[in-house]
Amino acid sequence: MVPGSCSSFGLLVILSFQNVPDVGGFPNVPLFSLFTNAVNRAQHLHMLAADIYKDYERTYITDDVRRSSKNSQVVSCYSENIPAPTDKDNTHLKSDMDLLRFSLTLIQSWLNPVQALHRLFRNSDVYERLKYLEEGIQSLIRELEDGNLRSYSFMRTPYERLDINMRTDDGLLKVYGLLSCFKKDMHKVETYMKVIKCRHFAESKCVI
């Protein structure tokens, strides 16, 4: 018992990004601008992920679906398999390079799943936005270290065997869980980027 189409997602995504400037891969710009662009990208991706999650919940997660969730397997977020900090105190204990590499790993872990979920992001450029942020983080790593762009190795393929079937309650709940993971991970990336920027550029209004 699946409600109508996902047309509302297209409009939502377009509105979310219509005012975000496209700076591509952050070519030859000062460090402050690299940080500002990366933080803005992460902020908008987190906002987008939260809006899509809420819209999906309103559209698909009915009371009947919620009742059936008691017997459904909960989706495990891939990010639980990497030692990325999950709270403010632990985040501040990590080095800049640790936070950048955690961010890079989280972004890269969503490149394939976002393509599989593309029909939920109709007329959007979520994948391209992830790629832009990936390039921005790589540029920061090059600037702050020796050009080594390694991220943390995937202990397993992120969200392998991803089968999207929205014709069943279990399928609807699986997508719901994935969108929740996407939202949480984009929040982490946004937080990490803000922490690093604040370390380099003491800003009076910078609150983490």
Swiss-Prot record:
Zn(2+) binds at residues 44, 190. It holds the Pfam family Hormone_1. The gene is gh-b. GO terms for biological process: animal organ development; growth hormone receptor signaling pathway; positive regulation of growth; positive regulation of receptor signaling pathway via JAK-STAT; response to nutrient levels. PROSITE patterns: SOMATOTROPIN_1, SOMATOTROPIN_2. Its main location: secreted. Keywords: Disulfide bond, Hormone, Metal-binding, Secreted, Signal, Zinc. This is Somatotropin-B. Growth hormone plays an important role in growth control. The keyword Isomerase does not apply. Belongs to the somatotropin/prolactin family. It is found in: Secreted. Disulfide bonds join 77-181, 198-206. GO terms for molecular function: growth factor activity; growth hormone receptor binding; hormone activity; metal ion binding. Residues 1-25 form the signal peptide. One of its GO terms (cellular component) is extracellular space.
